[in-house]
From Swiss-Prot:
PANTHER family from the UniProt entry: G-PROTEIN COUPLED RECEPTOR
Main function: Receptor for MSH (alpha, beta and gamma) and ACTH. The activity of this receptor is mediated by G proteins which activate adenylate cyclase. Mediates melanogenesis, the production of eumelanin (black/brown) and phaeomelanin (red/yellow), via regulation of cAMP signaling in melanocytes.
Gene: MC1R
Family under the similarity heading: Belongs to the G-protein coupled receptor 1 family.
Organism of derivation: Mandrillus sphinx
Chief location bin: membrane
Keywords assigned: Cell membrane, G-protein coupled receptor, Glycoprotein, Lipoprotein, Membrane, Palmitate, Receptor, Transducer, Transmembrane, Transmembrane helix
Lipidation (S-palmitoyl cysteine): 315
Protein name per UniProt: Melanocyte-stimulating hormone receptor
Amino acid sequence: MPVQGSQRRLLGSLNSTPTATPHLGLAANQTGVRCLEVSVPDGLFLSLGLVSLVENVLVVTAIAKNRNLHSPMYCFICCLALSDLLVSGSNMLETAVTLLLEAGALAARAAVVQQLDNVIDVITCSSMLSSLCFLGAIAVDRYISIFYALRYHSIVTLPRARRAVAAIWVASVLFSTLFIAYYDHAAVLLCLVIFFLAMLVLMAVLYVHMLARACQHAQGIARLHKRQRLAHQGFGLKGAATLTILLGIFFLCWGPFFLHLTLIVLCPQHPTCSCIFKNFNLFLALIICNAIIDPLIYAFRSQELRRTLKEVLLCSW
């Protein structure tokens, strides 16, 4: 994604200058301030992308194969996997093309590289937006299944889920195209940051409310069976730990990238902010790490999906 403070990698690859050796250490920025810069080796970047790609392809394949998984909940999980797949794939493609251009193995005119960069940017941005949207959609789906359990199947129907999925994809592509076209406007970056914060607040409110309801339900059961009070306390701690991990991973993986965008608006020339800008590739790597973790949290915990996945893997041998 083209952002101030980070070089557009494909266009920069047309220069014959060799890239710097990846390192973790202190580097001086233009003002002489010492910065902690974490460079992500291209090999590590490609490896993370490949792991994410394989994981999410397996999720999509398993859900597509098993008709028992053709429900609204798994529809959202499948689309989340597809979004994460595109995030990883687009970043892998950009890195691979960059390496080929730097090595001289791929000859291309600047105009062609510019168009390719724009296409990759749109794919990356739209898949990031859709990934955040589907994380929110999964939270809403789970909330309805708990608080409106008796009416769940009449509220969350497959046709409605498909319409929601279509709306998310169309909106993601449309807005990402606008964001890429007007990326140098502060309002565009602020919109992205506000969108991230809105998704974070939505997920936090819904999951905290769900945890409170679950603890209340467990407490009611414990009152009927006084001996199970310790089990109730353990359930509350386990639920709080799960919620902390879920929201913590989301914030840790996505937060630095959107902090980067926020600082571009607030302090584009400040020495401290310039130090943070140098770690842009690290922030992208964290998003790819989130794409690796998502299947573990939302997909592979399903026994039905794991069983289907085993069948798919056994059939492929």
